[in-house]
Amino acid sequence: MSDPNQNGQQGGQQNAGGNYYQQYFQKLTQQAQAGGGYQPYGGYGGYGGYGGYQPYGGYQQFYQDGQQAQQGAYNGYPYQAQGAPGGFNNYNNQFQPQQQSQGMTLDDFHKQKQTSQSAPPKQKKSLKLVSSSGIKLANATKKPKEDEKKEEEPKKEEKKAEPKEQESKKEEPKREGTPRPAAAKDEKKEDLPKLEKLKIKEEQAAANASGADSLIKEQEEEVDEGVVNDMFGGKDHMSIIFMGHVDAGKSTMGGNILYMTGSVDKRTVEKYEREAKDAGKQGWYLSWVMDTNREERDDGKTIEVGRAYFETEKRRYTILDAPGHKMYVSEMIGGASQADVGILVISARKGEYETGFEKGGQTREHALLAKTQGVNKLIVTINKMDDPTVNWSKERYDQCVKNLSNFLKAIGYNVKEEVVFMPVSGYSGAGLGTRVDPKECPWYDGPALLEYMDNMSHVDRKMNAPFMLPIAAKMRDMGTIVEGKIESGHIRKGHSTLLMPNKIPVEIQNIYNETENEVDMAICGEQVKLKIKGVEEEDIAPGFVLTSPKNPVKNVTRFVAQVAIVELKSILSSGFSCVMHVHTAIEEVRITKLLHKLERGTNRKSKKPPAFAKKGMKIIAVLETERPVCVETYQDYPQLGRFTLRDQGTTIAIGKIVKIIE
């Protein structure tokens, strides 16, 4: 048998496109037939187009500058890509066989199989043993199944194992003399991966499909009252929104409730009191608990929907403090869409009540918007009863109640069952946490505000319906976070959901409750923040909906709706455009067709479509949005099926979706 060093030198000097490589393996095949075996090939350097050569232990190595020969063993070759990418490891003057797998690519291996097809099966088996053994047989003989997978790994994995490869080279010739059945066994191992991979892929696909079904089934498992009681200590959650005209005392009332329930400590309130006094706004310090924005404190008016959380012995509450100025009605609508109960704050102070309730004041519009957004329980607090202009006057209180009752009845409230009135003082706290003093107000013996809210009937929740959460806000904090109220269903950490209307699959990584604490599950009615995976923050907008993958929310641009026109200076006809508020979404909408006019009192549909509509009329019409919007019919999901139409800063109509056009 010829000297492997000479063969290695000649083989290393061949280019990638040369024929010597094929000739050399044919020669090895002949030698193996004649001599019963062959020594391992010592590495084919430069293969792959570089044309270099790989040095052997007995070959003097010259650096590129051609100056000094290196006779002894050396460590670390300073130049890369000279036949062996990444440099060389320890080589000694004494010949050490090198594994073929170091310098051969997967394409070369297939070429090798083609050139050796004419050889007898035994030689083919031996050849495969050389190409696939090396480190694997020397170091992992007890785990042949793992070796099958390692053959297909990238070269980087092989490079990491080079030191062990060098240590096992001296033992390699002995392994070449192993019995033929072992080689045949290894040949089968070489042929198995393709079939095994195909089988594995099929099994994985089946597992993924069954896993998806089981995941959806798990996500739709019912949540009973026992689970909820264990999680929340038997306390259900209620979202309340403070509404009313600007300066009615909404933020002051909310801040005082937080202080009385212990959600804000005394030291913080005293700090706000000192700061307000220094700023010449001593009477506003309680409102600063809710109005944390500097602009809000300076102007004394709320701009954004403030959020706060408090807890009583019976319930957990989220406060939504809506802006009272007409410039921020859009924010108020977004807050009302997330509320269960509305607290309409009315100032009894002389002049302020008239300003808020008269045409153009926000008292009327806020009450209307609350009804439109599904706030069917309304608590009307006649505030500032301790003001010197009022002084707990029963006559003033009765006047306010009478006017408001007539108006609330006109916009759809059942005053006897859905509305309650009570006199309070948001600043002093009278009538909030405790009942008013009989000495000051002998004519009222009803409950205080918190007492009444704690004893209200539970809100009907769809805990086991498909999950839906309209997104009210988004942010980036070590990932993408969205905020909103769960309108139906429940959600657990790790659940898979769908972001509509973009149809992006996302995973729930973390769930945070009203107090910013991480929890494992949240149910319908909860105000939550969700950290989601699979979408970037810039690809989300308020009005998007996180929904169940199996029962996603409808994503449409056209629908049929029943519309009631409440305020319109001109007439409404086909082609009329305005702005639609539906849950947390705000979209431009156009009325494309008037279908029917509804008779007053009976709601009977007209046979002929009306040519136009005006204030006070109810119609059935087709509406079309500029972009896809996530909605449902009012019958299926009331919170996603009711909307408000606004034009030029005025609420002109309210409506509910009766049919989806897909």
Curated annotation (Swiss-Prot):
GTP binds at residues 244-251, 321-325, 383-386. Residues 73-193 are annotated as: Disordered. Coiled coil: none annotated. PROSITE patterns: G_TR_1 (PS00301), G_TR_2 (PS51722). Residues 143-193 have a biased composition (Basic and acidic residues). Keywords: Cytoplasm, GTP-binding, Nucleotide-binding, Phosphoprotein, Protein biosynthesis, Repeat. The modification Phosphothreonine is found at residue 318. Its main location: cytoplasm. GO terms for cellular component: cytoplasm. Gene3D superfamilies: P-loop containing nucleotide triphosphate hydrolases (3.40.50.300), Translation factors (2.40.30.10). It is found in: Cytoplasm. Residues 73-102, 128-137 have a biased composition (Low complexity). It comes from the Eukaryota. Residues 244-251 are annotated as: G1. Residues 103-230 are annotated as: Charged. Residues 9-102 are annotated as: Several sort of repeats. CDD domains: EF1_alpha (cd01883), eRF3_C_III (cd03704), eRF3_II (cd04089). Residues 235-461 form the tr-type G domain. Residues 383-386 are annotated as: G4. GO terms for biological process: nuclear-transcribed mRNA catabolic process, deadenylation-dependent decay; regulation of translation. Residues 425-427 are annotated as: G5. One of its GO terms (molecular function) is GTPase activity. Involved in translation termination. Stimulates the activity of ERF1. Binds guanine nucleotides. Belongs to the TRAFAC class translation factor GTPase superfamily. Classic translation factor GTPase family. ERF3 subfamily. This is Eukaryotic peptide chain release factor GTP-binding subunit.
